[in-house]
């Protein structure tokens, strides 16, 4: 059999090989047994959940210490790493896998969710300060926009200010990751 360890997010397209099964394992013990299929797994260490979304085919998801759960196309399984609870839902699969085509799709997304996805997509650190505790929900699709264009778009719909801090050069001539401060008033 073939086994893939995953921390982060990956989209898999796997041909069926019954004599050589394919498994994806996450650090928290959740495993996905793959038949010929196309699916996405999100397993970031700093998230409190692991998500599997099935686009085509069939997968079996094995949460730690629980029974196997079969996903069919259009289904999502979310495993809560703290409570060990599992939720199976129907989802808009394209919205979940469009990142592989360079698109960011948000449907009723909070600013916190958008910022986390922007950090990962553009490989930056974003410090988000919600000064008044306001909640906003966004619906947007970004295809070719730069990070600054997206932040400008967000700033037009809320009292949001942002600034980019210049990366600092280290002694070994590498640079720190770009940091962005986002303030919501």
Please tell me what each predicted stretch does.
Residues 2-83, 87:
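Short, small/hydrophobic-biased targeting/export segments
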Residues 84-185:
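N-terminal export/assembly leaders
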């Amino acid at each position: 059999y073939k086994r893939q360890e995953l921390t982060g997010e990956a989209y898999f397209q796997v041909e069926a090989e019954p004599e050589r099964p394919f498994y994806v394992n996450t650090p928290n013990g959740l495993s996905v047994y793959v038949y010929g299929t196309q699916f996405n797994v999100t397993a970031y260490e700093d998230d409190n959940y692991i998500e599997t979304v099935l686009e085509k085919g069939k997968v079996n998801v094995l949460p730690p210490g629980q029974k196997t759960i079969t996903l069919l196309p259009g289904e999502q399984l979310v495993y809560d790493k703290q409570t060990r609870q599992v939720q199976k839902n129907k989802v808009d699969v394209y919205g979940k896998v469009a990142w592989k085509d360079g698109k960011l799709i948000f449907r009723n997304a909070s600013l916190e969710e958008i910022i986390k996805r922007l950090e990962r997509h553009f490989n930056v650190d974003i410090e988000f300060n919600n000064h008044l505790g306001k909640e906003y929900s966004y619906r947007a699709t970004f295809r070719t926009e730069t990070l600054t264009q997206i932040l400008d778009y967000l700033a037009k719909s809320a009292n949001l200010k942002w600034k980019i801090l210049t990366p600092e050069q280290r002694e070994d001539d590498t640079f720190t990751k770009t940091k962005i401060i986002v303030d919501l008033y």
